[in-house]
Every structure is written in structure tokens, then in C-alpha cells.
Amino acid sequence: MESSELGQCADGFVAWLGRLGYSPRTCEAQVALLRHLGHWLADRGLPLSSLTSEVAGEYAAARRGRAQLRSERALRPVLSYLRELGAVPSAAVVVPREPVDVLLARFGGWLSRERGLAPATVSSYLHQARPFADACAGQFGTLTAVRVAGLATEGAAGLRPRSAQVRANAVRALLRFAWLEGMTAVPLAEFVGSFAAPAGPAIPKGLSPAQAAEFLVFVRSAPGGLRNEPMMALLLRLALRAGEAAGLLLDDIAWRQGVITVRGKRNRVDQVPLPADVGGPLARYLRDGRPAGTAHRQVFLALDAPHAPVTHAAVTSVAGRALRDAGISGNGAAHLLRHTAACGVLAGGGGLAEAGELLRHDGPQVTAVYARSDLAALRSIARPWPEEGGPR
């Protein structure tokens, strides 16, 4: 296909856009952009096969004086369609070339494969470990205990205690990987110092039963409520994490059995009962709100075309915005809803083991912090303050 022939594929482009859920008005604007792009390439004597990401950037820059569709983002539907046709080069894949980049790419693969960490967690580890890897130029063979301790301390300078501890954890993981891969003569992870963090984890806080009910009513009536109500109910009632809600697949819902499959941290898979107050909103969304004709298997999709699957960050953003708009204050929006589910178990007379099962924790030591939030249970075992002259 020649660049001057781009306008001839308008009908196919419109059909493709329609399948992705774009409105007729957006389709019309995108077709105009497609035709204009063809003329722009032809005027410069450029074949369609030369439309790389760099050339697309030049075209976007040439449109900046226009009122609309003047950014590289606006070109994404056009480029995606032409790439599917094989008419233009695929998006360039960045291949690590620098030694540190190669090292971190291998480290990321190890974290995902051997440790079972989620992509977002792997990305965080790589970000936190990069300053250390850069400081030693990826040359781990010459590292000593003293050098490791010094670099770790320098890398934590200026960070808050909790942030410094997060970075230290990432560096330790990197050094364990280096030891297992034979890059260091001795294990060095233990020489990364610990950084004083606030005394004990914060007491988990959740919404009151009244707040939780009002929150879901608010979400249901707000824009996007058909999708957002079941999404928030999964966090609030079943204690799913944001990433777990985002990753939920259509095949994970067993309606007859009344359970869903939850894929959690470290590749853990659990079967979780699906109560009516979660299953009802979920069924309504799938019947009346989820875009039709999509090939995506994820349950929750973006409200706007092209209706891509929602991300961990999108679920967190929906939770934060809904809490704020509902006038409910609190930190860590998605986790606040998750904490609500666990606190509800304790308030209803359940024990820590039951709360840990709901939260899908790896062990009781992780759930132990919730004992501090169950004040009624703590009062029942607290000894009275000794009075003067009384028994001690």
C-alpha cells in the first residue's frame, strides 16, 4: 500500500474503530487524520513503510498548530490499525544494551519467575535497585562487604526511613540474585544495613459499616457506577488487592459454584466465595455495562475506547476518587477498603485466623497487626491497672 492510498482503507478503519467502541464522531475525526497523514507522507515522497515511531513524531509536531488531533497520542489508533495490516513497521522493542540494563533485565526476570512477584512489584524493585547497580557499574565480582554497606548507605541518603527500607530490600534481593548467579564470590545481601522505621506498622483502619454501605451507594450512582460498584465491592467485601481486581478474568468466575479464582502475590491462587452483594453488581456490569465485542478476557475494561483492561493504578485511582468525592478521608484508598473487610471480620466476632484467610495472607505473623485494631478483643484480655495498696 502506498502512502497516497491511505484514504482507500477508510472503510476498514471505521469498522475496526467501531469494534473497539469508538463513537461515530471519533471515527470521522480519525479517518480525516488517516487521510491527512497519507497526504503528508506523499508530499514528502515518503513510502508508507517509512512510518516509524520517529516519523510519526515528526508528523505530530507538524500538526501542533491545529485545533485537535495534534499529539502522538491521537495517532495511536491510526498506527495500531496500520501495524495490524502490516503496512507500517511494528513499534520498536527496546533491547537492553548497557551492562547495567542487561543485569536489571535478568534480575527482573528472576523476580518474576522465581519469586512470583507481580509486574508492578518487579518494576518497583528494578527502580529501587538501579542506583546501587549504577554505582557499582554492574561489576559485582569486585564487591566487598564494606563496599556494599557504603553504597547502600549512600543510596538511602535523604530518604525517609520507610522509603530507605524499601530500597534496602530491593538491593538485598539484587545481591541474592547476584550470588545465586555466581556474580559474587560470597553472599553479600546481609551487609546491606537496616534503616529505622516508625515503631511497628500502623494500626489498620477501615470504614464503619454505615460508611461502607454509603460508599457503595455513592459509587453505584456516580458516573461509571455499573463498572465501579462491583470493582469496589471486590475490595470492600472480599478484600481483594487493586492488582487482583484488575487481573480478574471472565474465566475466573464460576457462577454455578458461587466462587471466583483470585490470583494474588507470588503466584498464589485462591478460590473465594462470591456473595450475592458482590455477584449481583458484577452480573449487572457484565450484562449491561461491559463493552461488547471485545477480545479481552479481563473482567474490568476502561470506560472509554479502545476499552483496554484496567490496570492496578486505575483501580487505585477509582477507589481514591470515589472516597474523596464521597467525603470519606483516609490514606491508601484501595488498601483502606481491603482493611475494612478484615476489620469487619474481627468486629463480627471472627478471629485473626479467619481475617488472615479472607486477606489471603501467607502466615499468621502478617495478620497479627490486626490484633491492634480489634480493641474489644484486646480489652477482654487486658489486666486492670493496679491500684495503690492492691495486688500487683
Language-model features: where?
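Conserved catalytic core of the tyrosine transesterase superfamily
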Residues: 1-392
